[in-house]
């Protein structure tokens, strides 16, 4: 199983730069993400509608496709429990002031770390830079050729 943040989830459905590389990586394993990633993904699609990057019919089709995949179990949505929020508090307590870490990114990183993932895939430079503070590695395959991984390479303990 591999962990995607929202920047990668969006590329599974929308042809942003790097979408082909993200889709190729997704084809190598099952995809997991924090449960709040669903809301972030839908919000990103709505932003594209608001900004005129997609038309209303395409927006409706995107939402329908996402809903169908969610109902089919295409993703493993990871919940945030007390351990996740404890991890977030601990990281922020010792986080250097120079590190830019948004709350939603902290939720992704803590969720992944507490769920046993050792790698988070993202195209978000701030999230990637902060990953080490959660004891995990951030990777970006955009502009690279993804290498298929075995499930155990992504989970420390499942």
In which residue ranges do the predicted regions lie?
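Acidic, PIN/NYN-like endoribonuclease modules and their adjacent C-terminal/linker elements
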Residues: 1, 113-158
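Structural signal for conserved beta-strand scaffold positions within catalytic alpha/beta enzyme cores
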Residues: 33, 79, 140-143
């Amino acid at each position: 199983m591999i962990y995607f943040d929202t920047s990668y989830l969006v590329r599974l459905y929308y042809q942003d730069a790097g979408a082909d590389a993200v889709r190729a990586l997704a084809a190598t394993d099952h995809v997991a993400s924090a449960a709040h990633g669903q809301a972030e993904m839908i919000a990103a699609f709505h932003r594209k509608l608001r900004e005129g990057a997609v038309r209303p019919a395409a927006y409706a089709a995107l939402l329908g496709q996402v809903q169908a995949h969610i109902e089919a179990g295409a993703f493993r949505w990871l919940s945030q429990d007390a351990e996740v929020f404890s991890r977030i508090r601990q990281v922020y307590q010792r986080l250097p002031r120079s590190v830019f870490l948004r709350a939603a990114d902290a939720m992704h990183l803590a969720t992944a770390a507490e769920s046993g993932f050792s790698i988070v895939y993202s195209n978000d430079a701030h999230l990637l830079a902060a990953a080490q503070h959660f004891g995990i590695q951030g990777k970006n395959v955009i502009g690279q050729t993804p290498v298929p991984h075995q499930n155990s390479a992504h989970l420390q303990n499942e």
